[in-house]
Curated annotation (Swiss-Prot):
GO terms for cellular component: glutamyl-tRNA(Gln) amidotransferase complex; mitochondrion. Keywords: ATP-binding, Ligase, Mitochondrion, Nucleotide-binding, Protein biosynthesis, Transit peptide. It is found in: Mitochondrion. Subunit of the heterotrimeric GatCAB amidotransferase (AdT) complex, composed of A, B and C subunits. This is Glutamyl-tRNA(Gln) amidotransferase subunit C, mitochondrial. InterPro entries: Asp/Glu-ADT_sf_sub_c, GatC. GO terms for biological process: glutaminyl-tRNAGln biosynthesis via transamidation; mitochondrial translation; regulation of translational fidelity. Allows the formation of correctly charged Gln-tRNA(Gln) through the transamidation of misacylated Glu-tRNA(Gln) in the mitochondria. The reaction takes place in the presence of glutamine and ATP through an activated gamma-phospho-Glu-tRNA(Gln). Belongs to the GatC family. It comes from Branchiostoma floridae. It holds the Pfam family GatC. GO terms for molecular function: ATP binding; glutaminyl-tRNA synthase (glutamine-hydrolyzing) activity. Residues 1-25 form a transit peptide.
Length: 149
């Protein structure tokens, strides 16, 4: 970052421009989209989810798919994930991190604030013995008959 400060002094660039340059140079996000069109014929057959699986997922995730539109969205999300089957990973070593090929600029690991437990726990809907409590798993969900046909 020091080289950017020197650049600022040399060129007399105003602060917003310098910040924009800094963000662009240090960003790990590509500046241009990197996706490609997917050949749908190479994907596995679309997944259809039966009502028993829907009910099971709703109870596990506490998400109510509610109607055909909710189920369609779930199936579309699975279809999107199916694109991973098209990725050729032959000869590719598993990664430790998605950014392992980049030098990441990290701040020093120094505690800057402390004793903020109460402030953090104040954000929770429910706390037991200084732990966040997830919603209970016994939330009543609609029966199969209540779904749109």
């Amino acid at each position: 970052m020091n080289h950017l400060h020197r650049l600022f002094r040399i060129t007399q660039v105003d602060r917003p421009v310098l910040l924009a340059i800094t963000r662009r140079l240090s960003s790990k996000v590509p500046t241009e989209p990197t996706w490609k069109e997917v050949d749908e014929s190479k994907l596995p057959n679309p997944t259809k989810i039966d009502q028993d699986t829907i009910a099971h997922l709703e109870r596990l995730a506490l998400v109510d798919f509610a109607n055909k539109e909710g189920i369609r969205r779930l199936e579309a999300a699975i279809r999107f994930a199916d694109q991973m089957f098209l990725v050729d990973t032959t000869g590719v070593e598993p990664m430790d991190s998605v950014l392992e090929d980049r030098e990441l600029y990290l701040r020093d690991d120094v505690v800057t604030e402390g004793n903020c437990k109460d402030d953090i726990l104040r954000n929770a809907g429910k706390v037991v013995e200084d732990y966040f409590v997830a919603p209970p798993g016994n939330i009543p969900l609609p029966k199969k008959e209540e779904y749109d046909s």
